[in-house]
């Protein structure tokens, strides 16, 4: 099933490019920003397109509700987006998979764990296009989220303040 939506926020360079082509960004503009919470094969995820990820309030819409956040970016400022995705993995307490063009790099898969092991994959970029894969242990993430404590063997960090356990239980039921 394909699900389409108008982008909620366009980067300044995108708006500039559209204007040079005599186009307008996101017309017609929705009265309310929209994001999709998708449940597929018992995995809950949402997608953010590039500059949308920079809105902290909009990222917080899915706190406690996601297993994975997918971020599709096209931006040369990879450090800026790396910091945002690291924050999202910790604040939303979910995996974050970010894709960027191979020319810029910065594509990564992060998990909400200590910094030294939070990058499951990180691609710096270059001329060779490639596909890398990793396994995300959704079950282990949810089990760690359910427990109110962590032991020394846990790689998943403590839940952030305000984590909604009811939302976790609801997510696990479906």
What are these regions (language model features)?
Residues 165-174:
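C-terminal functional modules
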